Amino acid sequence: MKVKILYLIILTNLFILPVFSQKVQGYVFELDKEQKKQPLPGANVFWAGTSNGTATDTEGFFELNKPSHDHADLVISYIGYRNDTVDIDHNDGKLEVILASNATLDEVEIAERAPGAHISRTELIATQQITLGELKKAACCNLSESFETNASVDVNYSDAITGAKQIKLLGLSGKYSQLQTENIPNFQGLASSYGLSYVPGSWMESIQVSKGTSSVKNGYESITGQINVEYKKPENKEKLYVNLYGNQAGRIEGNINSSIRVSPKWNTAVFGHVSNQSTLIDHNNDNFLDDPIFTQVNLFNRWHYHSEKMEGMFGVKYLNEERKGGQVDYYSNEPGAKDLYGTEIKTNRLEAFSKTGFFLKRPETSIGWINSYIFHDMNTYFGNNKYDGLQHHFYSNLMFQTYISNTAHVITAGASYVFDYFDENLNDSAFSRNEHVPGVFTEYTWNLPEKFTLLAGIRADWDNLYGFFVTPRLHLRYNITKQTVLRASAGRGSRTANVIAENLSLLTTSRRFVIKEKLDMEKAWNYGLHLTQYIDLLGKEMSINAEFYRTDFINQVIIDKEHSPDHIMVYNLDGKSYANTYQVEVSYELIPRMDVTLAFRYNDVMMTIGDTLMREPLVNRYKGLFTVSYATNLRKWQFDFTTQVNGPSRIPSTEDLPEEYHMESYSPVYTILNAQITKFYKKWEFYLGGENLTNYTQHNPIIDPGDPFGPYFDASNIWGPISGVKIYAGVRFLLKHDKL
């Protein structure tokens, strides 16, 4: 056997050595503003269709073994530049390659031609880019209202009283996806119920939605995917930006942004947001407010520093919010009004972050360090239920990245630390938690540009509450053809359940929480396939995206409100729990300046509640989406129209309640229509729109609203809209810097 292996090695080398017996040498340059050649260090140089390659040195020089056959194609690539392909013969002359920057071309395409929401062609992980143009197709007052034109993310009310909204990704609650702001984990813990409303729409530059497991360098928590928000940058062109909004329900908002160039190396930006709703509205006459009344003040200051050896971003945010709901007469001045049912949530939140990067002499080599601190103080009551929470959160992530042999092989390694302190009080029960999680990770990327990419990562973390655990993850991207891209992912995620904070909507019931046992960490595997096909149709490109994702829980914390009419039982999973999600989406420019998207998603989500495997409650079986966006010539007007068809979802069982409080087993199918018209001027934009134009609302969303302190009161079985049609109008003003 050993002789055969030795013979095979010798025979293989006899064939391989002559193939790379000669060398090709050359230089790679770019042109500066004066059209003079400048060396381009770290450029990728490789033979087309192979993994044989190298990287240019600090002088732009490269040397590479050359195949013996004629007409071999040498590919030169560099991020931010257009690839060049050179046909090599057997002469011994040195090559000179000048790469052209594609920055100008990309800027034009993004501003004028790129769709508002699209799957990035170049990203390893299937990532939907929701651009600023897409965000402007609806009112988009905050992050929770930014997915109206998106098929992947569902946003629903979590109860009929507080106005809180929750997202679902891959058919599962948003707590299983990782919410980030500029790739920093955010809105976990006490912010999980209302955090989506803490990001004003006017602050956002773009949103990235990726499904399945993420990179290990972002942590261990992501199970179903990531939603990352990019704020507007201090170095952008917005000298002054103002957005004013109001609707017929009495909600008004004001936003102001300004970026300032302090010095050649320093830029800063300030953001301000104020919103208010004080009108009492009860359209369904159940004596409960359809929308809460609230006031929010939100401030943000960020800085950007850039030099040849270092780049840094720093910021501080502060939020103060007070929202109230409950019975309409609770807010009257009549005697005894305060004996009625009311809710109040007071929130003070402070965030501070820093992101610093250090560029080393070796090409494509850097050190990055991210730090974040969050203070969150919440004081609430829901009728007779009183809940107070305090959280201190600290996150630190140190990363080193370089390449091995050439830039086709990149290695990233680092260490992270997460600290969470919780002090919670629910009625007469106190809960506190100190959690420390140090961890290390490494990640390897193998990239054959325009053909194949592999990302393999693993991290090891130690939690002082749950011990040691390992998180492996794998991503693949293969260009089957230039028009067909296949992506695959697999990996595991883990998270600590925050039972009360993540389920504040259940405090709008008469039931009491009962935690039956010591709760384990939630853990799950996620697997996914994503296929993108581009088709040239009538001179325009149609994109078709088809995907399948499966989530298998190893352990899940079950919130069971179906096996006791008096209690909400909380316990670890004992059985199966999984989610299968299938989605197809087609996008096409039907006629010039008219973009059309048609999508359909099917959810198969099952969990073991008690000892029975059943459909997870309040998850739509399917969703259909149809959007049309048309801009007139020279973009003087824009018309946007969105239709959502929401399939049935299982309603938690009400069989243990008196017959008059029974609800149907499944919700009906319903349709939502949204539309907006925008008029553009040089510095001004005026918009007029309508939400829920079908005026569809959930019938009788509250069980026993006439006796809110009685044993059957429940405002948490929400599957549809609570508010009817809303007409809104607004104005945007933009004054740009002449030059930054």
State each model region's role:
Residues 368-380, 479, 487, 520-572, ...:
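Membrane-embedded beta-barrel scaffold of Gram-negative outer-membrane proteins
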Residues 144-185:
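Extracytoplasmic beta-strand/coil segments of soluble accessory domains associated
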Residues 494-495, 596, 645-654, 678-740:
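C-terminal beta-signal and adjacent terminal beta-strands/loops
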